[in-house]
Amino acid sequence: MRLAILADIHGNIFALQAVAARLEQLQPDAVIVNGDIINAIPFSDQVVDFLRRTDWLIIRGNHEFYYLDYASGRAPASWNDPERWGQLHWLMSHLRPEQGDYLASLPDELTLFYPEAEPLRITHGTPGHNRWGFSNLMPAEDISTTLRDVSQETFVNAHTHLQIDRIIRESEDPLPEETGDPAYFLEEAVRKPHRIWHIINPGSVGQPLNSDTRAQFAILESVPTDVVPGGWRVSHHRILYDRRPALEGYHTTGMMEAGGVISELFYWELVTAEREIPFFFLWKRANLPPDVYSFREQFELYKRATGRDAYIRARDPLLIGGF
């Protein structure tokens, strides 16, 4: 059994088309898209239409919830601020109602039970929290605590835009003979069993954040559990594609003008495959007093202080050529 796992397309139809072409060659038995199919890049409508024509399994991510929650009682009033949330406002006017209905019908997670393979759990973030994710640097104890109620040993997530293939072992209780506990004399079966999880993140199709601008996904192959814990071996893939049409779209569709600072930061992330949005927010919290400058003024001060805009221009394919 071979599964293709895609995630975090973020409206990048060109990256999605490149990955789909590679999947035609690889011929997996099934394709799963693990959330965040829309927003960030200006072609969400085309991505939704593309996915609706497939038989792929699709999961909602946090960006689908941004769209579905806006203009409802679930959205905070702060989302009405066009300076901070103009990107979302632009998206609202560029998806058709039936596309929104499609997003509303998607599940938040999947648990797959193929008869010839071990079960696996798939969520965009962590169970019950689609805006949380894991990284390769996160302590194993924190991950095992989060997954304690997940019975499946293979856990596929996304959200961080980072490719992950990591085995997590829950810390075992001290052996009774080490503590002097009378349980030392009990049967082995009464001791707390050792837990293990195989954490897999396919990376991002449309907007990777691991300093590699190629479109990224994963192939999972079912294997015996004594070969890989959880029974699924992962191979990560990275596909070169032409990013220039996606970058041009920020200007030709009006997203850059409507979305302001956030759209510009999304553009930067497509150029660098680095965490431009967190970089900016961390800098302004550390260096600027609250409620003094507008959001745009904060961003201009950030560029002036860090020279980050020059860093972007030196790498922008629309300015220097290449993909």
Q: Where in the sequence are the language-model features?
A:
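Beta-strand-turn-beta hairpins that frame and shape the catalytic cleft
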Residues: 1-3, 111-121, 193-199, 228-233
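N-terminal active-site segment of His-dependent metallophosphoesterases
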Residues: 1-56
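Active-site neighborhood of phospho(di)ester-bond hydrolases with catalytic His/Asp-centered motifs
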Residues: 6-7, 31-36, 57-62, 123, ...
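Short beta-strand scaffold segments in enzyme catalytic cores
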Residues: 109-113, 163-167, 216-220
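Ligand/cofactor pocket segment of small-molecule handling proteins
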Residues: 133-187, 192-193
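Acidic, His/Gly-rich catalytic cores of divalent-metal-dependent hydrolytic chemistry
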Residues: 175-323
